[in-house]
Amino acid sequence: MTSHGGGEVRGERIHTVQPERDLVANWEVDLSEKLEEYLLKICSGEITGNEEDGQIPVNFAEAALLLQGSVQVYSKKVEYLYNLVLRTLEFLSKQRDQEQSKGTSNENEASSSRQVDEEENDLFWNVDDIPVDTKNRLDSSVGGDTCPSQFVKPPANLVVLEGDCLDTSGDGGELESYLLATTHLYRDFILLDPCDAVAVNEFLGDNYGGKGRNSAHRGSSVRKSFHSSVGRSGGSARKSSVGKNQGTNVHLSPICGNGPNDQNCDQGSQPPVFEDNDHGFDMDNEYGGAMDFSDTDADEDDPWKPLNPYEPGKLKVKPFKKVKILKKIGWSITKDHMTSMFPLARPNGPISSELIEIWKMHGCASKDEQASQDIPYYEKLREMLVNGGNQPCGANGNYNDNDKDNHDEANNGDFHDFGEHDGDDAEHPFMDEDVLNMNDGGAAEFHNYDGFENGESNCQESLEDLCRSHLDALLANIAKSEKQTDLAARVSTWKQKIEQNLEEQELHPPFDIQEYGDRIINKLTVEESGNVETFTDLMKDQEKHEVARAFSALLQLVNNGDVDLEKPGNSTNEPMCYTAVKPFSVRLLKVHNRKNEKRGIHLPQKRAKSPITKGKSHESPPPKKRNTCSVSSQTRKVSLKISKINGVGVRCTPNSKKRRKGRSDDVTEVTEVASIEKSLGKL
């Protein structure tokens, strides 16, 4: 870029930046510095000369073009750099390919020697000649094939039991404290409690089902090794897993010595089988005898042997924690106790069995009285529902069913009396183990006693109550609907008429009472009948809504004093009904009265002040110019004042002081009336 003008002296001439045509010269120009100088000169006001003095004024269009050209120059620089980088990379890649093609022959020679060295090294790592030990082979059926779906949980009883040789003061991690030296393995697990065998089988599944005789013998040895740790524990392994493993049933095959066929027992073919059923933890075999895991010393190794309460234990004694007792527990216990002592009353009938007959007789008598009256249909339906579909009792109190002792009054049909028997009745036990009999399939068979039907009776009674309430609600709705049918029909017809009238009213133009009043007055002035016309002639050929609007406007005109209504044939002023045959007439009053009333309506006059004032001199008002329009209004004011004055003179006050003052006021009032009359005479 070049500078225009003398660049040696700064103050004589201003340097202006001009674009360079040569691309090589653009690399040497510091464009940012030039622009900063140019902007500084513009802001300082140095560019203020004329062209005659040799200074060029500021040309903003030229400056904008200069900026645009500088952007293009920079973009060209970036493009040149990009092309240069691409060509350099291409040259380097071609040179590398040539070097690789030349070096392939040398690499082949070097690789052959390298392979020989690798073969020599592989001979050192060859282990095919080493014999394989069969004992070191892992069981693939347990360890390799199956993978646990969750983390392994340690056995619950792998803890120190009471009575073990545990030194609490020393190291608690010794093997002797956990009795690991005296226990045996069961399916690769150390068991301190035989009940944990169920958890082991559940964890491993049925993977041992297809194993050979060795695993079977191992399973049969469980019977001997289950109680090895209990001997030293002093019977402290009594804790059962019944609470933890509820729903688990252990069905064992008949062990030799317990079943009837001891010779046919094969220990190597049938390992103990553990199944998961929902029958609880069953410790009995299928022959009714108790299962004994030990061989001879069953009494010594009994895990369920109770502890000696007088033998002190070696574990640390923890203090008892205070627990808040919930009130609900005590309340439920007391409630159950009270219900057992005092049975609940039945919904139908007395509690005491001695009063049942009397209650039945009263019930039949009341039914006879009701039967004498007219029973509605819904009452008959309800009575049939209460009686279970049978007819009600007769007048003599006899029921349709012959059995009176086992039936209730509310259940004359097939419903039995479920609350008849007391809790002390030995003939009808509620829950007795002797009642249960086993059928051929092994299921418990219950006899159909009345005591077992209490739940069914409650269900039946609740169903009856529900049906009664539903029937009552249904009948009430039917009665309401019957009453509301006529009213609903009338309301619907009225609603239709009103909606039609409202739609018609919306189509009519808005009501202007002044416009309708002007129409009536215009008709009365045009007629030649002396400003008197009947209302039927005025409303001839008019619609209903127009007649109603005109009548309301007529009433407003009467109130304003523009027109007057004449009632022919009514001298006594009694109320009469005027029709089109016998109409009333409308008389138009003076036109100027109507105009004055209009003016009075639009501009209401102020209320005239009372002339009775204290401490003021009553002077006559100043004379005014004559105005014919204000004569009537002034006469009205005068009459109003006179009436007020007369009213004040007649008024009586209870106080004597006010009477004396009233006499002096009467004199002033008389003088004021005289002055008002004189002023009116002058007008």
From Swiss-Prot:
GO CC terms of this entry: condensed chromosome; nucleolus
Function: Regulatory subunit of the condensin-2 complex, a complex that seems to provide chromosomes with an additional level of organization and rigidity and in establishing mitotic chromosome architecture. The condensin-2 complex plays a role in DNA damage repair or in protecting the genome from certain genotoxic stressors (e.g. boron excess, zeocin and aphidicolin).
Residue spans of biased composition, Polar residues class: 101-114, 238-251, 260-270
Basic residues bias spans: 214-226
Induction data: By boron excess (B).
The UniProt record lists the keyword Nucleus: yes
Keywords: Chromosome, DNA condensation, Nucleus
Listed name of the protein: Condensin-2 complex subunit H2
Subunit: Component of the condensin-2 complex.
Keyword Nucleus: yes
Principal cellular location given in the protein's record: nucleus
Family membership noted in the UniProt record: Belongs to the CND2 H2 (condensin-2 subunit 2) family.
Tissue: Expressed in seedlings, roots, stems, leaves, flower buds and flowers.
Alphabetized InterPro entries for the sequence: CNDH2_C, H2_M, H2_N, Ncaph2, ScpA-like_C
Phenotype when the gene is knocked out: Enhanced sensitivity to excess boron (B), to zeocin, which induces DNA double-strand breaks (DSBs), and to aphidicolin, which blocks DNA replication, probably due to the accumulation of DSBs. Reduced root length, especially in the presence of genotoxic stressors, with twisted shape, ectopic lateral root formation and dense root hairs, as well as short meristematic zones.
GO terms (BP aspect): chromosome condensation; DNA damage response; positive regulation of DNA repair
Basic and acidic residues bias spans: 401-412
Ranges in a coiled coil: none
Alphabetical list of Gene3D superfamilies matching this protein: Structural maintenance of chromosome 1. Chain E
This protein's encoding gene: CAPH2
Location in the cell: Nucleus, Nucleolus; Chromosome
Region (Disordered): 96-119, 210-310, 392-412, 593-636, 649-683
Highest taxon of source: Eukaryota
